[in-house]
Amino acid sequence: MAKKRNQRNLKAVQAAKARKKRRNRRRRRAIVLAIEVIILLALSATAFVMAKYDKFQRVEINSDDIKINSGVKKEGYTTVALFGGDSREGELEAGTRTDTIIVVALDHKEGVIRMASIYRDTLLQQDDNTYNKANHAYFSGGPKAAINMLNKNLDLDIQDYATVDFKAMSDVVDMLGGIKIQVTDPEAKMLNKYVGETAKASKKKAHKLNGGGVYTLDGPQAVTYARLRKLEGGDYKRTERQRLVIKKLYEKGIKADIGTLNKIVDKIFPQVSTSFSLKEVLSLAASASSYKLGDSQGFPFEKTDGIIYRTAGDAVVPLGLAENVEELHKFLYPNETKTVSSTVQMISTEISNLTNVVRPANMNTEEETNTDNNSNSNNNNNSNKPVITNSTSDSGNSKSNNNTTGGGTE
């Protein structure tokens, strides 16, 4: 009896071992399958980006041609330039007017993307050391000159850029099903006035709004909204609208299905000019979902406008470029301790001397800085007025022809 019992126990143990072996085998197969799936997905994503990459208008910029001020190096951050071209013809090189100039900083430690719009009429030193409006750099020398202008004046370390034609923005909005935005009565009135022009350039139908309210804007409406300028707040308020549209697109884009994203890529990539290599695009694509969109600002923080400077015409003048750059770095790179370079100090002094605009001694940059929630458009309406020692020295000169004319969107 004991012998039979031992035999049964032995068989039970052997059966248990066999079951365990089968389970381990299945588990190993499952693990291998899971790894294969992950690799397949990764390879698919890589293959997807590689297949689409050649659709970009790729512009290679020699790193030796990029100028970076001495001592400027950003550890833990990647900073890129984003330009919005208004050629509306798909031509995105020199000769293109850039209504939108945005510095985008990726904070790798915190996983945050911060944006700063550079007001297009800001008087800055150009790549050739002359002075003109910020958007003149791209117009006269293309993306390389624009990057160098940003690096030199703002102590940035920008190596790459992307330029998007306005038609591309219209297409993206429509392909994502529109973006929900609250529009004021004055904005609706101006939008209705110019949406036809935008729709015609995009080869789409124009739809007007019924006054102010919350709307799901279509492509032409969203682009027109982002470009409205001749309203209270002028270009300052316009940059806020641009950043809002980008934020709304980002929020919808990260929720889009792969089919929609595929269509967007096929449609949009040909309307994008960039210096990013395939390796860099793959790296950005792989990490994109892990970043959240943070705050945005307009630059310069303290400024005065209506200053006529030679051929630049009616320009926005920073009230102390050096102080504004210091505040910009506090915003874009909060973990960095920054002292502005001697180059920025020199440019800051030159702008003050050339325009006769002096920063008030009692102005505190940090206290004066406003976020989008506090309406950046009102920054220069404060009690610390700029001291203009001689505002008429260049008032008789004609305005530059590098800016578009006419229309509330210009």
Report the location of each language-model feature.
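Extracytoplasmic
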Residues: 75-78, 96-101, 110-118, 129, ...
